């Protein structure tokens, strides 16, 4: 049982102003595995004050000093690898192999990318007699989601530290353990007091007062659209800068010259990875009518090989859904798909056989899906694929862009000219060609209702900066 009922404020583990706690549930066992403080406004006020007090000092540190700090973090993060992997498997239910290969590694990659971005990043630019300066924005509030406890948290922290902005972090109350380990890492390597503050709690008690605090100059949030909208509304009262990474309903366009087995394997992975709890999941798979039958036969074969089960057992590829609430939501969407006339091709409602305990869902494929159906328009956040057929490339692109979201898109095939045309035509912040993968120095963010701003690498650093022009500086 993990007991993390203290907050990390101004370089110290301190008692929360609140006596209440939040239980953390292992979604694979449905058992309580720990608790964290249920913080309140007083905790937030204390944390923001600590960050504000150190702001000017941290802002004026040199690039080399901040690089050295990030380098220390990288080394200690690597030392805590096993602790991070175990925590994520416990709190999220991710298979151990996924916790190590994806969750742990992505968190590390962002600290490395921010450190390395500072090698060539120009914080000052001369323009004739004038000077343009980029300065740390100030106290930044970070609110992170449960589906990627290290990735989403590390990318924000790394960028803020690189920019010279102190932070107050509110991680998800459903997966808070990884953030506590990060706090321990920062404490060990000597992150200056007040630069990093951790306040555990829920949205009402911590998220709202953080978003509304007059000394917070920037809010960076990853999560659902409705919550992002509320944060924007609260931040607007004093015109805070806001960076949002929100939902998606990403298209995966399969071209007619594709290797069908490769395409089926790739599209399967994009839907079942992290139990489908991925904002960039390619859940709308667009397939040419002329290869539909062959593709579906191979797709069923690929899905049949996916092993759902205990995240601590070797060979498990897909763990549980994060909570009963989320499990019920996934079930509701599956039932909605059936009600609206989509054809259930694989999986369906309920739990996989032998997995009655835990929030396990059946990987599911719907075919003959109309893009206007609920399952094709709304983010499900579970291992559910909608297969949509198209006649020609123009129709595929039209269907791909017929969504309120624009976070990611995918295309797979052989003809380079066609691949490039599709990639440029998809209205999304990130497009992958032939499973190329996203490097941590590339910008990440969404079009339309998928968010505002960009994260990762130097683009992420810029979210935590203000731009100042000084006329006549060199006269």
UniProtKB/Swiss-Prot annotation:
Query: Which residues act catalytically here?
Result: 245 (proton acceptor), 279 (nucleophile)
Residues annotated as binding NAD(+) are 146-147, 223-224, 246, 379
List the Pfam families.
Answer: Aldedh (PF00171)
- Name the UniProt key words of this record, in alphabetical order: NAD, Oxidoreductase
User: Source organism's superkingdom?
Assistant: Bacteria
Report the catalytic activity.
Answer: an aldehyde + NAD(+) + H2O = a carboxylate + NADH + 2 H(+)
InterPro entries tied to this protein: Ald_DH/histidinol_DH, Ald_DH_C, Ald_DH_CS_CYS, Ald_DH_CS_GLU, Ald_DH_N, Aldehyde_DH_dom, Aldehyde_DH_NAD(P)
User: What Enzyme Commission number does this protein have?
Assistant: 1.2.1.3
Listed transmembrane segments: none
Q: Which GO terms describe its molecular function?
A: aldehyde dehydrogenase (NAD+) activity
Instruction: Write out the GO biological process terms.
Output: aldehyde metabolic process
State the family it belongs to: Belongs to the aldehyde dehydrogenase family.
Q: By what name is this protein known?
A: Putative aldehyde dehydrogenase
User: Upper lineage ranks?
Assistant: Bacteria, Bacillati, Bacillota, Bacilli, Bacillales
């Amino acid at each position: 049982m993990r007991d993390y009922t203290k907050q990390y404020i101004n370089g110290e583990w301190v008692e929360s102003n609140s006596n209440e706690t939040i239980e953390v549930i292992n979604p694979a066992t449905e058992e309580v595995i720990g608790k964290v403080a249920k913080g309140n406004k007083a905790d937030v006020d204390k944390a923001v004050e600590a960050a504000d007090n150190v702001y000017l000092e941290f802002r004026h540190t040199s690039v080399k000093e901040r690089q050295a700090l990030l380098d220390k973090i990288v080394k200690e993060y690597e030392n805590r690898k096993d602790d991070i992997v175990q925590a994520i498997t416990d709190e999220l239910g991710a298979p151990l192999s996924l916790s190590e290969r994806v969750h742990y590694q992505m968190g590390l990659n962002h600290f490395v990318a921010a450190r390395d971005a500072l090698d060539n990043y120009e914080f000052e630019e001369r323009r004739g007699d004038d000077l343009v300066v980029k300065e740390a924005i100030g106290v930044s509030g970070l609110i992170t989601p449960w589906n990627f406890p290290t990735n989403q948290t590390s990318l924000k922290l790394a960028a803020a530290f690189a920019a010279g902005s102190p932070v107050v972090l509110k991680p998800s109350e459903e997966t808070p353990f990884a953030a506590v380990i990060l706090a321990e890492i920062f404490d060990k390597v000597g992150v200056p007091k007040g630069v990093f503050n951790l306040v555990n709690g829920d949205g009402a008690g911590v998220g709202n007062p953080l978003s509304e605090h007059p000394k917070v100059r920037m809010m960076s949030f990853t999560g659902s659209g409705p919550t992002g909208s509320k944060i924007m509304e609260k931040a607007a009262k004093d015109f805070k800068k806001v960076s949002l990474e929100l939902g998606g309903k990403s298209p995966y366009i399969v071209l007619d010259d594709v290797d069908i087995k490769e395409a089926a394997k790739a599209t399967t992975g994009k839907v079942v990875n992290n139990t489908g709890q991925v904002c960039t999941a390619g859940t709308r798979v667009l397939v040419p009518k002329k290869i539909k039958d062959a593709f579906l036969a191979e797709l069923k074969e690929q899905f049949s090989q996916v092993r759902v089960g205990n995240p601590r057992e070797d060979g498990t590829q897909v763990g549980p859904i994060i909570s009963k609430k989320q499990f019920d939501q996934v079930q509701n969407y599956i039932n909605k798909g059936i009600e609206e006339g989509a054809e259930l091709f694989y999986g369906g409602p309920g739990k996989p056989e032998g997995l009655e305990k835990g929030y396990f869902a059946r990987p599911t494929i719907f075919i003959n899906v109309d893009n206007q159906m609920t399952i094709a328009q709304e983010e499900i956040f579970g291992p559910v694929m909608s297969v949509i057929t198209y006649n020609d490339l123009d129709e595929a692109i039209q269907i791909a862009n017929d969504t309120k979201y624009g976070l990611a898109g995918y295309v797979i095939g052989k003809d380079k000219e066609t691949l490039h045309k599709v990639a440029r035509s998809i209205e999304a912040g990130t497009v992958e060609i032939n499973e190329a993968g996203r490097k941590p120095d590339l910008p990440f963010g969404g079009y339309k209702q998928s968010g505002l701003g960009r994260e990762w690498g130097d683009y992420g650093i810029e979210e935590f900066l203000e731009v100042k022009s000084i006329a006549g500086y060199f006269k």
